[in-house]
Every structure is written in C-alpha cells, then in structure tokens.
Amino acid sequence: LTSKLQYGAQPLRRRSTQAGPFLRRVVAAFCENPLAARCTLDCSITPAVETAILHADAALLTRALENVLQNAVRHNAGPIMLAFHADADETTLHLTIQDDGTGYPQSVLAVLNGEPEGESAPHILGLHVVEQIINAHGGSVQFVNRDPHGAKGMMQLPLAKDENEK
C-alpha cells in the first residue's frame, strides 16, 4: 500500500461522507478491538463536524485513523488515557488523537520530519502510511510529543467544496 500511495498507483474510491457519523463508526470499531481494553478513551466530536462533508475514500481514511489509535495503545506499557477530538471550520476537518503515554521516540519524529534515516532507522511504517493516506486526500498531518509526556497526532482534511463533491 505504501508504495502504491507514494507513486499514485492506489486509486482513491472517493465518496461523499458525513464526517460525524463516519468518525463515530471508526471510534466505535476501535472500542470493540481488544486493544481498547488497555486504555480509557475520551471522544469529542463538535456539532460543526455533524454537518461537515468529506470527499474521501472511507476505507483508507479508516485505516489511517485506526493506525494512530492502535499505535497509541500498542507502543505504551500499561493503561493509557487516549483522547480523540474532531472539529471543523468552513473548509477543514481538524482531528487530534493524543495519549498520555511515553510519546514518540525522537528518532521516529526525526524520520517523520524528513531527516535522513540512519543505519538503525526506526520502524515507522504505520505512521508513514497515515501520512500518505492523509496527503492523498489533500490533507496534512503532524506528529509531536506532548509536555510533560504523551504523543499527539494532528490531522487536517479538506471538506467538500461544492455540490459536485457533496
């Protein structure tokens, strides 16, 4: 998938998608995953998201969001607090997924921020796929560490612009 996305060989099956119900389905599916037993999840979806329309490949976008949610649990020992927040303005859907775990290793953040990979490059395939999927939808993503600890993924996706995309 990553090679197909990188070279534009993965066709996007875009459909008009109501952001609110779509995001609730993604979060509900995560809650049914056995990994969810290792975290407490706080989900916040603002009213603006309910009327927002994405022109998106729902399966690929689901995969990206699942990767971030599952990574938060997989890469932290013990129970964590996980927060999923969605908001929208007139043009953009803003998603934030954050946890109170150990955060991203600096080597992971360095590679995600475009620094050359060294001989002992970290494993970032899941987060790289997230970047590619969000970018393929015309969006952007940023991964950072929280102070004093924890990880945060911030994603922005364009909303459908006109009736032809809705």
Each PLM stretch: what is its role?
Residues 126, 130:
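Short alpha-helical Gxxx[C/S/T] motif in the catalytic ATP-binding
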Residues 8, 33-45:
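Short conserved segments within the C-terminal catalytic ATPase subdomain
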Residues 7-12, 53-56:
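Conserved micro-motifs of the catalytic ATP-binding
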Residues 13-28:
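A conserved beta-strand-to-alpha-helix junction within the catalytic ATP-binding
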Residues 71-73:
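Short helix-loop "hinge" at the ATP-lid/N-box region of the Bergerat-fold HATPase_c
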Residues 79-91:
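Short beta-strand/loop element within the Bergerat-fold HATPase_c
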